[in-house]
Design a protein with these regions (language model features):
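C-terminal segment of N-terminal export signals and the immediately downstream linker at the start
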Residues: 1, 23-49
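Basic side chains
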Residues: 4-5, 9-10, 205, 278
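Glycan-processing catalytic domains of CAZymes
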Residues: 41-296
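N-terminal export signals
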Residues: 6-29
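Short non-domain terminal segments
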Residues: 5, 12, 31-34, 56, ...
Length: 296
């Protein structure tokens, strides 16, 4: 029986969710791919007209439903090299930790009982992003309390310390550190969502001199390991527009982009929902990313 894990391996997606963005980040210029050892220059031109190129990817090292990778730096560098060769210029660490598992030795989180990581993945990702001229976005910490309580305000306190220590120890030292990713996934009427995203987004910008701060979109109803649409989570286009207009109104001054997940709706509804997403993003001066991560 083929599992989602097998599928990811066979398609060489490296366990990452793909972010499609027309102008995600220009970067400092195209790298000379002929300089990559053992890597042929690839033609990344789209085979279909008027399509968006895949220019960014999540680094989903600490995940909810996928076992953690056990790669070392050799394997990760090969991954970065291949990603850069096909035109990906932006990598987003989807979260810096989940519950007790963390990607870097955070003094604050270790003091709260988190496990000491065997390797400083954050430092490694930033070094590789520097080497391959890629932009890196840091995903905030997920304590798991939101998933337990439905109240996103729980995530503010730990991230106050995480944001400060990450900027001091990593962000201010690596040229590839391009911004922050608010990793919380929300659905409509999520308790504390607007205040939490605004508080975390503002702190990210304040400490880093205004670096970009994108955030994730709605929790998806089509799960990555299945094909069933959760009918209880269904929402109309009009309702979607009203809810996200309220959210964007409350966060647009500190959040630069929103990456809507594509798995909440059926295929024949994509155009209508995507049109609303783009209209709202334009209204509030935000970027609208397409987070095609469901593999459904």
């Amino acid at each position: 029986m083929n599992t989602r894990r097998d599928f990811l391996k066979k398609t060489a997606l490296f366990g990452a969710s793909m972010v499609t963005a027309p102008s995600l980040m220009a970067g400092d210029g195209e790298a000379d791919l002929s300089l990559f050892s053992g890597q042929e220059r690839l033609n990344t031109a789209s085979t279909v007209e008027n399509t968006l190129r895949i220019s960014g990817t999540f680094l989903d090292e600490i995940s909810h439903d996928i076992p953690h990778q056990n790669w070392g730096e050799k394997e990760w560098e090969q991954d970065f090299r291949h990603m850069r060769a096909i035109g990906i210029d932006t990598v987003i660490m989807i979260r810096s930790g989940y519950r007790k598992f963390i990607t870097y030795p955070s003094m604050h989180l270790l003091g709260k009982g988190c496990y000491y990581p065997s390797i400083d993945l954050l430092d490694m990702f930033l070094r590789l992003a520097d080497k391959y001229s890629m932009k890196f976005y840091f995903g905030l910490y997920d304590s798991g309390r939101y998933w337990d309580t439905g109240d996103l305000s729980w995530e503010i306190e730990d991230n106050k310390y995480v944001i400060d220590e990450v900027w001091q120890n990593y962000g201010s030292k690596y040229k590839s550190f391009g911004g922050w990713y608010i990793s919380g996934e929300i659905s409509r009427a999520t308790k504390g969502a607007i205040d939490a995203f605004h508080a975390m987004g503002k702190q990210c910008k304040d400490v880093s001199g205004g670096l970009p701060t994108p955030r994730g979109g709605r929790k998806k109803a089509v799960m990555a390991n299945g094909s069933s649409l959760t009918k209880a989570d269904a929402v109309s286009v009009d309702e979607h527009e009203r809810e996200w207009n309220e959210i964007f109104d409350g966060i647009h001054d500190v959040v630069d982009a929103c990456a809507f997940q594509d798995g909440h709706i059926d295929y024949d509804e994509l155009d209508a929902f995507f049109a609303v997403n783009k209209k709202l993003a334009d209204k509030y001066g935000m970027q609208c990313w397409t987070n095609a991560d469901s593999f459904d």
